[in-house]
A protein has these predicted regions:
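N-terminal leader/targeting and accessory segments in enzymes
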Residues: 1-94, 98, 265, 285-288
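Adenine nucleotide phosphate-binding catalytic loops in nucleotide-utilizing enzymes
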Residues: 3, 8-10, 44, 62-63, ...
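Residues in the short beta-alpha loop(s) of Rossmann-like NAD(P)-binding domains
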Residues: 11, 34, 140, 216-217, ...
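Short, glycine/serine-rich, charged loops/turns that create anion-binding
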Residues: 12, 35, 114-115, 141, ...
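Short amphipathic alpha-helical face segments that pack within enzyme cores
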Residues: 16, 122, 143-145, 272-278
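Alpha-helix C-terminal capping segments
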Residues: 23-24, 104, 126-130, 278-284
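Beta-strand->loop->alpha-helix junctions that form or flank phosphate-binding loops
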Residues: 32, 51-54, 93-97, 135-137, ...
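Phosphate-binding loop of NTP-binding sites
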Residues: 59-66, 73-215, 219-230
Length: 289
C-alpha cells in the first residue's frame, strides 16, 4: 500500500479510489483542475487534501511527494502530470488496477468500442440467473473499487481503453474483447494505440484463464493469436466457437437459446449474446441461466 497517493480528478471513480486508499491507511492528495462545489465537498467529507489547478511548480512538488499517481479515466494523456511522473519515476496506476489488487474475487472484464455496457450487464444477469451472485461495475456505473467489496462470487467489469492503459498486473479470469472502431483518438492519438490499450485486457492472463474474442473483427482476431490464455471466439460470419446454427446460439457446451427467443435479435444483439454466453459459462454460469 502506498504511503502517499496522488489522485488526479475527483470524478466518480476518483472519489471511490480516494476513499478506499484513505481507509487502507494511505495519505491521499487529490488534484482537480476544474473542481466544483461537489468535488470540494467530496474532499472535505473524505478528509483529504485537495489541490486546485496547480501551476507547474506546485504540480512537480505534488508528484515528488507521491508514491503512486492514480488518474481518473477522463484525464488526458497530454496532462503534465504524466510527463512529470515518468521523469521522476513515480508509478501511475488506475483505479481498475488498484481494485484488482484489492480483491481475490474472480473478475470478468469486458471491453470494446461498442456493446460493452450491454454485454457486461448481460453477463451479470446470466450469472445471477444461474444462482451465481454477481455484480456489474467498472465503467458501467459502480466503480470497480466499490464493486469488489460487494458480497458476491463474481465481479463483472466494463473496462475502457483509458482504464486499461494504466494497468500493469490486471488479470481477469475471463477477458472479453468485442470490437475495435476508431474512437477516442483525441486521447490515444492513433487507432493502433487505442487497440493496444484494449489488448491489455488479455496481457496478464494465464493459461487457465479465458480470452473471448470476436472472430469477425480482424484487429481483435490478430491480437487473440498472441493471447496467453485459452481463446474462445464468437462470430456471425467467420468460423467461431460460439455461433448461430439453424437459428440457435450454440457453443462448445451445446445449444444456448434460439435467436427468436432473444429480447432483441439484430445482428449486433446476437453477437453480444454469444459473447456474454461464453463469458458467463466460463465464470460459473449454466446453460439454463
Amino acid at each position: 500500500m502506498p504511503e502517499i497517493a496522488l489522485v488526479v480528478g475527483l470524478g466518480r471513480s476518483g472519489v471511490s479510489v480516494a476513499r478506499h486508499l484513505h481507509e487502507r491507511g494511505a495519505r491521499v492528495l487529490a488534484l482537480d483542475d476544474t473542481p466544483d462545489d461537489q468535488v470540494r465537498a467530496h474532499a472535505t467529507r473524505l478528509g483529504i487534501d485537495l489541490v486546485e489547478a496547480p501551476d507547474l511548480a506546485a504540480l512537480t512538488a505534488l508528484v515528488n511527494e507521491a508514491d503512486v499517481i492514480v488518474p481518473s479515466p477522463g484525464v488526458p494523456l497530454a496532462h503534465p502530470v504524466f510527463e512529470l511522473a515518468s521523469a521522476h519515476g513515480v508509478p501511475v496506476r488506475g483505479e481498475v488496477e488498484l481494485a484488482f489488487r484489492w480483491t481475490e474475487l474472480p473478475l470478468v472484464a469486458v471491453t470494446g468500442t461498442n456493446g460493452k455496457t450491454t454485454v457486461t450487464a448481460l453477463i451479470a444477469e446470466m450469472l445471477t440467473a444461474s444462482e451465481v451472485p454477481a455484480v456489474a461495475g467498472g465503467n458501467i456505473g459502480l466503480p470497480l473499487s466499490d464493486a469488489v467489496r460487494r458480497d458476491v462470487e463474481v465481479v463483472v467489469a466494463e473496462v475502457s481503453s483509458f482504464q486499461l492503459w494504466f494497468t500493469d498486473t490486471f488479470r481477469p479470469k475471463v477477458g472479453v474483447w468485442l470490437n475495435v472502431a476508431e474512437d477516442h483518438l483525441d486521447w490515444h492519438g492513433h487507432v493502433d494505440s487505442y487497440a493496444a490499450a484494449k489488448a491489455r485486457i488479455w496481457a496478464h492472463q494465464l493459461k487457465g484463464d479465458l480470452a473471448v474474442a470476436n472472430a469477425d473483427d480482424p484487429v481483435v482476431s490478430r491480437y487473440a493469436t498472441d493471447a496467453p490464455a485459452r481463446v474462445e471466439t464468437f462470430g456471425l460470419v467467420e468460423p467461431a466457437d460460439w455461433r448461430v446454427v439453424d437459428g440457435v446460439l450454440v457453443g462448445p457446451p451445446g445449444e444456448v437459446i434460439a435467436v427468436s427467443e432473444l429480447r432483441r435479435s439484430l445482428p449486433h444483439d446476437v453477437a453480444n449474446a454469444l459473447a456474454a454466453s461464453a463469458a458467463a459459462l466460463a465464470a460459473g454460469g449454466t446453460l439454463a441461466g
